Design a protein with these regions (language model features):
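Alpha-helical multi-pass membrane segments and their bilayer interfacial helix-loop junctions
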Residues: 1-247
Length: 247
């Protein structure tokens, strides 16, 4: 309530101050500093990227009076550019995550200008898939974060399409989760397998509830599917433990 009473100039000034202050404080921490300080720098710069996104969104919305999709595009682009410059493909997980979030928001906003939720979801999923591929090839450091972040984006994108494709969305998400589990197990990429399992635990109940909501066998089906997912999890854990060499 109080935030709404703050003038636009005050909001812009506050966001600009936070973005600049957190960036400057983080910039004082050198790469050779203690690990705790390096993590602090990552958190500060993440906050700076978030403030830059809020500033850009505020300008687009309250100053330019742009439509909602353009506001998301501006906010995401600002975060992606600022975080990308701080990241510069180095081992900086927080900046990697901030850049990915910015790219996803910007891509979703751009898709929203021309289409509806289905277009937004598909574009977000496509960006996530590209991020997974880059993590697979170890192009984006750290690769584990690229696999996990991109995988989550693909699953989220499938869910976003539900506003237009209520029947197809849960099936699409479940298919993506199954592919992640299968590929992760076959190639011993545990992060991708974990993302697939988490997606399965989310999309499987959704799929069963959506298509069989009036069936008396839903509780039994949920139980069987839950047991199946737990069995897959145990298999993955056993394969992973065997793949790790003994020291």
């Amino acid at each position: 309530q109080y935030w709404r009473e703050v003038p636009t100039a005050g909001r812009l000034g506050l966001f600009a101050l936070v973005a600049a202050a957190t960036w400057l404080v983080g910039a004082r921490i050198a790469d050779g500093a203690e690990p705790a300080l390096i993590r602090l720098r990552g958190a500060l710069w993440f906050a700076s990227s978030a403030a830059a996104a809020a500033l850009a969104g505020q300008v687009a919305g309250d100053v330019a009076h742009a439509r909602e999709s353009v506001v998301w595009l501006a906010a995401g682009a600002a975060a992606a550019v600022q975080a990308g410059l701080l990241w510069r493909l180095r081992d900086r997980p927080a900046q990697h995550l901030a850049c990915l979030a910015g790219v996803l928001v910007a891509a979703g906003g751009a898709a929203g200008i021309a289409g509806g939720p289905a277009a937004v979801g598909l574009v977000v999923a496509a960006v996530g898939a590209a991020w997974v591929a880059a993590g697979w090839l170890a192009v984006l450091p750290p690769p584990v974060l690229a696999l996990v972040g991109g995988g989550v984006a693909v699953l989220a994108g499938a869910g976003i399409t539900a506003a237009d494709w209520s029947d197809a969305a849960p099936l699409l998400g479940l298919a993506v989760a199954a592919v992640f589990v299968a590929v992760g197990v076959a190639t011993v990429r545990t992060p991708l397998t974990v993302v697939g399992l988490v997606g399965g635990f989310g999309y499987l109940p959704w799929t069963i509830g959506h298509f069989f909501a009036d069936s008396l066998g839903v509780p039994l089906a949920m139980l069987v599917c839950g047991v199946a997912l737990l069995a897959v999890t145990l298999v993955v854990l056993r394969r992973t433990s065997r793949a790790v060499p003994a020291h």
